């Protein structure tokens, strides 16, 4: 191929995909250029079908919707990584107890401001608040990070006191302390998948790329970026 494969992804997988693409190319695979943007924007652009894209990486349910719409080739979806949602505070701030569901609920109720993302973790967090019966109580204190901006950035700036997002989005943000994952009974985990964009002339190459990214050889890179193989 004379031109790199063109890909698009959500921000949550930006670093792990860069590492996996580099490993793929190091063992002789085709060059890959992946643009990472907010997941909602990425899905919208693939759905619009106006760009010459070859591969898309998004949350599993987003890939399913694109496949149902005919924008991702049928049967091409490959689950790649599982990412856990964690809680974080500004570096040096007191660490609230989040070890149980009741403790986390109390921490949320006590926080003067709460940050969450536009991605799947944010959607799941809002659903959790609704199940707890506190959605209305905390509504005025919740802040949604702009698309493509890590919640950790808002935490580090002091714009929110308690934030939630994928671990992979927060581990490289300076100025925050990660408290840890949510308790097992209310864990918010997201599977990210890849798919062949319908109409690409490089479908076979993309399938080989996705097979490599799902292989045991890719597990180490995933764990280094705070994720687990799917």
Where is each model-derived feature located?
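Exported/periplasmic ABC-transporter solute-binding proteins
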Residues: 1-35, 40-49, 57-69, 74, ...
